[in-house]
């Protein structure tokens, strides 16, 4: 996968340990997310997220990526390919910089990501949403995702 093709508007690259400070900066400002998804972010929790893998997945399938405008981190995404099954992509996190929220940037990133993943042959995209978080549920719903399972997290899915 060529991650640069996940967005038509932003420069996309993998994020690594050198990026923890800028990820932490945008994460800290997204306080509403952490009201529903405690504990509050730490630099260690970011590092752990970068390394976390679901069962039976390898780092070849994981893309912890940033979307940049000039040198500013606009959003970060944790994307797992072929999870939970083949031809389903799973977005474990999409965090949009608060300075870019409420103007369609997150939706544009989701739309571009969906278009590219469909070109690659993916059939569905799933996300896990904190059950009590109305802001996240609304965001994913307005982007065409439907709740397919309600447990601790709502699993939402978009058929491509």
Please place each PLM-identified region on the residue numbering.
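Short polybasic/polar patches that bind polyanions
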Residues: 101, 118, 141
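Conserved GNAT acetyl-CoA-binding A-motif
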Residues: 117-128
């Amino acid at each position: 996968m060529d991650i640069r093709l996940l967005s038509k508007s932003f420069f996309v690259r993998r994020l690594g340990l050198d990026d923890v400070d800028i990820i932490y900066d945008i994460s800290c400002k997204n306080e509403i997310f952490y009201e529903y998804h405690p504990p509050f972010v730490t630099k260690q929790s970011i590092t752990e997220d970068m390394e976390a893998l679901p069962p039976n997945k390898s780092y070849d399938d994981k893309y912890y990526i940033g979307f940049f405008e000039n040198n500013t981190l606009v959003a970060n995404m944790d994307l797992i390919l072929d999870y939970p099954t083949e031809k389903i992509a799973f977005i474990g996190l999409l965090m949009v910089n608060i300075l870019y929220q409420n103007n369609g940037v997150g939706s544009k990133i989701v739309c571009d990501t969906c278009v590219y993943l469909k070109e690659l042959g993916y059939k569905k995209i799933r996300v896990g949403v904190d059950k009590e978080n109305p802001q996240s549920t609304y965001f994913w719903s307005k982007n065409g995702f439907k709740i397919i399972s309600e447990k601790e997290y709502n699993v939402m899915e978009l058929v491509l």
